[in-house]
Amino acid sequence: MRKEKKIEFLKILNQYQIIKKEKIEKKPSFLSIETARYHLNGNITLIREKIKKNHKDGSAIIVIPVTKEQEIITVIEPRVCIKNGVGVGFPAGYIEENETPEEAAIRELQEEIGYQPEQLIPLISFYQDEGISSAYNHAFLARNCQKVSEQQLDPDEYIQYMKFKTEEIEELIQMGYINGSNSLLAFQYAKEKMRRMRK
């Protein structure tokens, strides 16, 4: 990775570093837990808890956006639950009610980075954490993305984005900056898909 690009990347990371944490007493408004008893064949009964997000299962999409210049767009945002407090990954978000995964992918691209793809290719669908959630995620490769608007972020959403070559993404993974399972899985499938398409 070029020195100037690395400096720009680290500058963005530094902007989102946690400098102080204050615990507050507040009833959760987004997360809830549903407890149920399950009766299985073989005379087995289980009691399990399931996490719900905004009263839904929390199914989401993740998109690997690639420009016409073959650069991959990453997003950098505060992720206060992880060790260093800053997440580096790819555009992602929840699937809204009455929305298909494809529609959610296109919406999230426009909201988070202001880009629109010429082609959206499904890569893989997977359960995020089947032990406590029914969230079923969908990964996409977005080809020939073009800038069409400014970001359309929520008031409490802070996202910056940067473009990288495939080798630079691999470097960020090796350095531990991209470490979310959704991002890692989607990138591996996207990389393989792009390799096969070049043949």
For every predicted segment, state its role.
Residues 1-20, 85-86, 97, 155-199:
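Nudix hydrolase/Nudix homology domain
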Residues 2, 50-52, 61-107:
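Conserved Nudix-box catalytic region and its N-terminal flanking loop in Nudix hydrolases
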Residues 18, 23-24, 122, 147:
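Residue-level detector of beta-propeller blades
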Residues 23, 49-50, 77, 127:
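Short clusters of small/polar residues that mark proteolytic maturation junctions
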Residues 24-64, 68:
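Acidic, metal-coordinating catalytic segment for phosphate/diphosphate chemistry
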Residues 27-28, 82, 130-132:
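Short glycine/serine/proline-enriched coil/turn segments at secondary-structure junctions
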Residues 59-62, 67, 93-181:
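Unchanged
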